[in-house]
């Protein structure tokens, strides 16, 4: 049996488990989490209660959803030092690039902007050529190819995994929905009775 949670739903599920009723999870062979940062403490609690392998997945809709993975159990989980599990390693046919403001690769451990490459990238945003042009850009390392600017800030870890550090813009998520604060600001300011 396999199941897939967003981390907040996994947290609610784990909160309902006790050592006695956790036996209901014994048939789980794999558990996947995606959609939000996956807290390290939650993974450790899950592992202690169930022993079912937990995998962290990462990826935006603009790139066929899941573009990286990280095993959130066993020795890999034990080695995690941060508050959330790394977003991990690229899946097949996917590239992860972490670049500085000059579009140069950053060294291990240095924060930069996360870009995605590969055949799974969307063509762009329907009816939004301006947004498409700003997010889907030419890949300076692969002539004729494109890459997607995620807006996520990340860094390379010593083991080659990628760690998510936050956002470089004012986007946030509420209940899994992307909220662009700049769009709300512009819409409010366009109203006749609103001033800043």
How would you describe each model-predicted region?
Residues 2-4, 14-86, 95, 105:
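Gly/Ser/Thr-rich phosphate-binding loop
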Residues 52-56, 71-196:
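AMP-dependent adenylate-forming
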Residues 9-12, 134:
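The DHp (HisKA) dimerization/phosphotransfer helix of two-component histidine kinases
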Residues 9-10, 38, 121:
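Alpha-helix capping/helix-boundary segments
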Residues 8, 63, 177-179:
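Conserved catalytic/ATP-binding subdomain
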Residues 11, 44, 186:
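Active-site phosphate/pyrophosphate- and oxyanion-stabilizing loops and adjacent acidic/basic residues
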Residues 6-7, 184:
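Conserved glycosyltransferase catalytic-site signature
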């Amino acid at each position: 049996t396999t199941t897939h949670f967003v981390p907040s739903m996994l947290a609610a599920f784990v909160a309902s488990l006790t050592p006695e009723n956790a036996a209901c999870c014994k048939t789980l062979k794999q558990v996947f989490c995606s959609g939000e940062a996956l807290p390290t403490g939650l993974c450790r609690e899950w592992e202690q209660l169930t022993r079912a392998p937990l995998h962290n997945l990462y990826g935006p809709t603009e790139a066929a959803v899941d573009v990286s993975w990280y095993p959130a159990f066993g020795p890999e989980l034990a080695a995690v030092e941060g508050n959330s599990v790394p977003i991990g390693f690229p899946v097949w046919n996917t590239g992860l690039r972490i670049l500085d403001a000059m579009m140069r690769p950053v060294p291990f451990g240095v924060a930069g902007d996360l870009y995605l490459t590969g055949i799974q990238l969307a063509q762009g945003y329907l009816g939004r050529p301006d947004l498409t042009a700003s997010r889907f850009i030419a890949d300076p390392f692969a002539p004729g190819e494109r890459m997607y600017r995620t807006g996520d800030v990340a860094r390379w870890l010593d083991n080659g995994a990628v760690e998510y550090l936050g956002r470089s813009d004012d986007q946030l998520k509420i209940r899994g929905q992307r909220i662009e604060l700049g769009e709300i600001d512009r819409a409010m300011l366009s109203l006749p009775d609103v001033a800043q």
